[in-house]
Design a protein with these regions (language model features):
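Conserved catalytic cysteine-centered active-site region
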Residues: 10-64, 68, 72-107, 115, ...
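Phosphate/pyrophosphate-binding loops at sites that engage ATP/ADP/AMP, CoA/4′-phosphopantetheine
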Residues: 1, 29, 211, 251-264, ...
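Condensing-enzyme catalytic core mediating Claisen C-C bond formation in acyl metabolism
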Residues: 91-115, 123-150, 182-244, 317-318, ...
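Beta-strand segments within the central parallel beta-sheet cores of soluble alpha/beta enzyme folds
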Residues: 1-3, 35-41, 66-70, 139-146, ...
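Metallocofactor- and cofactor-centric catalytic cores in central/energy metabolism, strongly enriched
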Residues: 2-20, 24, 80-82, 135-142, ...
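Glycine-rich anion/phosphate-binding loop at the beta-strand->alpha-helix junction
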Residues: 260, 271-278, 284-342, 346-353, ...
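Accessory "access/gating" subregions that flank catalytic or transport cores
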Residues: 159-217, 256, 263, 267-283
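Active-site-proximal alpha-helical scaffold in enzymes
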Residues: 41-71, 116-157, 202-209, 256-260, ...
Length: 385
């Protein structure tokens, strides 16, 4: 997964970079892989890669795939403050194959109005959600606090989480010195926390190879259903800002592929960079506000940590632990890139899949999404108001 410093100059490390990260990993493992892939930016990419490699493995095109990523922005920040001299430059040679969509997530017109970053787009979506619910600001702040209190509680019980205080809904919704406004209506503790040190990896293979390599069967987890889809790319052209046809469809396709319903899912890890991402996902998947099932198994990006493009690798790894503890149960992971734009979903269980593993061609669903109505943006509005 692409490192944050390679995504944005804002996060560039003063200590150098690796020119070919997947090859550097392969060298350390004494491996000679057929493919060396390095993603473009997108929080959807870990689940997207799982979906892609599952299909390749099922078709006999790939025997083993390693999906991995890491961020060390906390260590980098601390080392810079301490004036340390560190050399992270590495050139293992060659260039990786890039994968993903590297288009800007915003239009020229949006950029003209300073809409370029997640911390500007997601608050915009949040205010659309509040407007649709006809809530006043105070009531909506309380509702967001209650929602993210659930994530904070999950992080409190997770030894790998970076913020384990177990914040209350009131604390999360109250502006204070350590919970200042970032962009209305989000205070600091409702934002993804990118300044962390975290790494995760997922290994994928077939049942035959797992047996051949002696991987204990109690460790096996199967991908029962999956889907990928992209909403209208330009946020200002979307018909509604409080909806995501792509999330709705990804969940439906993944569940249909597995022959399951939403009621059959024991736990969810919904992409949680900001409250609006979780609220829209819950609505589109059909998870009620008072549903007691987990909506995050890690603690989410604000409390577990938001390691750039790699968060969902952590989601998947932790969901594997969850379903292993409850053999036969099902867990759903959703992933989101850009501004509630690029989506992937996966349904996991220790229960083996039945029959040949086949997924619907993602192009079919994407064609449906691309045919949805779009708003026309008036770049030169007039009027007296």
């Amino acid at each position: 997964l692409e490192f944050f410093p390679d995504v944005s100059p804002r996060f560039a490390s003063p200590f150098g970079r690796c020119s070919n990260p997947p090859k550097a990993v392969a060298n350390r493992l004494a491996a000679a892989p057929r493919q060396l892939l390095y993603t473009h930016s997108g929080g959807n990419m870990p689940q997207y890669l799982v979906n892609r490699f599952a299909e390749e493995i099922a078709n006999g095109e790939t025997e083993l795939a390693l999906i991995c990523g890491a961020e060390l922005l906390r260590s980098t920040q601390n080392a810079r403050k301490a004036g340390l001299k560190i050399d992270h430059n590495e050139d293992p040679g060659g260039e990786p194959t890039r994968i993903g969509d590297n288009r800007f997530g915003f239009s020229d017109e949006e950029a003209r109005h300073e809409l370029r970053a997640a911390i500007h787009f997601y608050p915009l979506l949040e205010n659309a959600i509040r407007g649709g619910l006809k809530r006043d600001v105070a009531s909506h702040m309380t509702a967001m606090g209650r929602l993210f209190e659930r994530l904070a509680a999950a992080a409190k019980d997770n030894p790998l989480a970076t913020r384990r205080e177990g914040y209350s809904a009131e604390r999360l919704a109250t502006i204070s010195d350590d919970n200042r406004w970032i962009c209305f209506p989000y205070p600091r503790l409702m934002n993804s926390n990118a300044i962390i040190d975290q790494a995760a990896a997922v290994l994928m293979t077939s049942v035959g190879k797992a047996r051949e390599w002696g991987i204990p069967q109690e460790r096996w987890v199967f991908l029962h259903g999956c889907a990928d889809g992209t909403d209208t790319w330009v946020v200002s052209e979307r018909e509604r800002l409080d909806a995501s046809p792509a999330i709705r469809g990804c969940a439906r396709i993944a569940l249909d592929m597995a022959g399951k319903s939403v009621a059959d899912v024991a736990a969810f890890d919904l992409y949680s960079c900001f409250p609006s991402a979780v609220e829209v996902a819950m609505k589109e998947i059909g998870i009620a506000d008072d549903d007691p099932r987990p909506i995050s198994v890690t603690g989410g990006l604000p409390f577990f940590g938001g390691p750039g493009n790699n968060y969902v690798t952590h989601s998947i790894a932790e969901m594997m632990n969850v379903v292993r503890k409850r053999p036969g149960s099902f867990g759903m992971v959703t992933a989101n890139g850009n501004y509630l734009t690029k989506h992937s979903a996966g349904l996991y269980s220790t229960e083996p899949t039945k029959g040949p593993w086949r997924r619907e061609d993602p192009k079919k669903f994407q064609t449906e999404l691309d045919a949805l109505p779009k708003q026309r943006v008036n770049t030169k509005p007039g009027g007296t108001g």
